Regions:
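A short acidic, Gly/Pro-enriched loop at the edge of an enzyme's catalytic core
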Residues: 44-52
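C-terminal hydrophobic helical "lid"/dimerization subdomain
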Residues: 3, 7, 13, 108-161
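Glycine-rich phosphate-binding loop and adjacent beta-alpha segment
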Residues: 56-122, 160-161
Length: 161
């Protein structure tokens, strides 16, 4: 079993990749993009998981019992408020923690793979972005409409090219 902490764009990309290439039972902890995630989205996690991919700034991965013995944590987000932990459960359970980074040898290859997956339709991002805005003439509308979202509006983006 696998848990993704965070329900934004990066979580959606990770989920789409895993769903296309692996057979995991996936739960997603988050509050955003409810229409997109459907029943995968959870308000809390009450199980343990073989793999936890943490893409959020909160500290659940360190404060809750989420990872099985010899499990894996992929820590993909800085903890903006800091964390307080003694790591005793992670140490006792021989949990592996990895930190993805642009300095990691496979990072560029992963980004190239994501581009190909989007181009071929293997990674479906159509439901994630609702509207594009011209950066010269509509940038203020992008922020306004994002703050006061109409039904069906998920996310907007500003076109830079």
């Amino acid at each position: 079993r696998l848990a993704i902490i965070g329900s934004g764009f990066l979580a959606w990309v990770v989920y789409q990749y895993l769903n296309a290439h692996y057979f995991f039972e996936v739960d997603v902890l988050g509050k955003s993009n409810k229409e997109l995630w459907g029943d995968k989205l959870k308000d809390s996690l009450d199980k343990t998981y073989d793999i936890v991919i943490d893409l959020n700034t909160r500290d659940e991965v360190f404060t809750q019992d989420l990872v099985t013995e010899q499990g894996l944590i992929v820590l993909g987000a800085e903890k903006s408020n800091g964390i307080t932990t003694r790591f005793e459960k992670l140490l006792w359970n021989a949990v592996t923690v990895v930190f993805p980074s642009p300095r990691q040898k496979n990072f560029k290859r992963c980004m190239e793979m994501a581009v190909k997956m989007i181009e071929t339709g293997a990674l479906d991002i159509d439901k994630f972005w609702s509207k594009g805005y011209d950066r010269e003439t509509e940038w203020q509308d992008a922020f306004k409409e994002s703050d006061y979202r109409m039904p069906g509006f998920n996310r907007g983006y500003i076109e830079w090219l």
